[in-house]
Amino acid sequence: MAMSLCPLLLVFVLGLGLTPPSLAQDDSRYRQFLTKHYDANPRGRNDRYCESMMVRRHLTTPCKDTNTFIHGSKSSIKAICGNKNGNPYGETLRISKTRFQVTTCKHAGGSPRPPCRYRATPGFRSIVIACENGLPVHFDESFFRP
């Protein structure tokens, strides 16, 4: 029994070594993007929502000045990276062809240390992102057209 597992284990270990490091890093950046900017089904979109989400997503040490949460499906956000739901925007960014429900949380001022106070701005707009290997990895907060 142990002898029959050795070839399988060898193939598995060799396969791990052949996984491109860039692929693993890209997936990590995508997961980080989701943590910072994705919330499929928000419960309320007010100041309290922003304050709890920013703490829950570890964006308050120090208090992040601005962060936007996208409310939609992961597949529709990923589609911005291709031609299905996205167009080129500037040199390296993509703009969505469709509008997304979003909540933008802005730091209300005061100390950059917790507890952080945020003001919520709910909206419905196009979003601009950066993509790597077909995955969103950065949300452009400077694009704020309704």
Swiss-Prot record:
Cytoplasm: is it a keyword of this entry? yes
Which residues does the record give as tRNA binding sites? R45, C105, I127
Q: PROSITE patterns, from UniProt?
A: RNASE_PANCREATIC
Q: Which GO terms describe its molecular function?
A: actin binding; copper ion binding; DNA binding; endonuclease activity; heparin binding; peptide binding; protein homodimerization activity; receptor ligand activity
Any inhibitors or activators noted?
Has weak tRNA ribonuclease activity by itself due to partial autoinhibition by its C-terminus, which folds into a short alpha-helix that partially occludes the substrate-binding site. In absence of stress, the ribonuclease activity is inhibited by RNH1 in the cytoplasm. In response to stress, dissociates from RNH1 in the cytoplasm and associates with cytoplasmic ribosomes with vacant A-sites: ribosomes directly activate the tRNA ribonuclease activity of ANG by refolding the C-terminal alpha-helix. In response to stress, the angiogenic activity of ANG is inhibited by RNH1 in the nucleus.
Biological processes, Gene Ontology terms: angiogenesis; antibacterial humoral response; antimicrobial humoral immune response mediated by antimicrobial peptide; cell migration; defense response to Gram-positive bacterium; hematopoietic stem cell proliferation; innate immune response; negative regulation of apoptotic process
Which terms are listed as keywords in the entry?
Angiogenesis, Cytoplasm, Developmental protein, Differentiation, Disulfide bond, DNA-binding, Endonuclease, Hydrolase, Nuclease, Nucleus, Protein synthesis inhibitor, Pyrrolidone carboxylic acid, Secreted, Signal, Stress response
E.C. designation(s) = 3.1.27.-
Annotated catalytic residues = H37, H138
Q: Where in the cell is it found?
A: Secreted; Nucleus; Nucleus, Nucleolus; Cytoplasm, Stress granule
Q: Which cysteines are joined by disulfide bonds?
A: C50-C105, C63-C116, C81-C131
Name positions with the PTM Pyrrolidone carboxylic acid.
Q25
Q: Record keywords: Metal-binding included?
A: no
Q: Where is this motif: Nucleolar localization signal?
A: 55-59
Q: Which GO terms describe its cellular component?
A: actin cytoskeleton; angiogenin-PRI complex; basement membrane; chromosome; cytoplasmic stress granule; endocytic vesicle; extracellular space; growth cone
Query: Where is the secretion signal located?
Result: 1-24
Instruction: Describe the family membership recorded for this protein in Swiss-Prot or TrEMBL.
Output: Belongs to the pancreatic ribonuclease family.
Q: What does this protein do?
A: Secreted ribonuclease that can either promote or restrict cell proliferation of target cells, depending on the context. Endocytosed in target cells via its receptor PLXNB2 and translocates to the cytoplasm or nucleus. Under stress conditions, localizes to the cytoplasm and promotes the assembly of stress granules (SGs): specifically cleaves a subset of tRNAs within anticodon loops to produce tRNA-derived stress-induced fragments (tiRNAs), resulting in translation repression and inhibition of cell proliferation. tiRNas also prevent formation of apoptosome, thereby promoting cell survival.
Instruction: Describe the subunit structure.
Output: Homodimer. Interacts with RNH1; inhibiting ANG ribonuclease activity. Interacts with PCNA.
What PANTHER family has UniProt attached to this entry? ANGIOGENIN (PTHR11437:SF60), RIBONUCLEASE (PTHR11437)
Protein name per the record = Angiogenin
Q: Which organism is it from?
A: Equus caballus
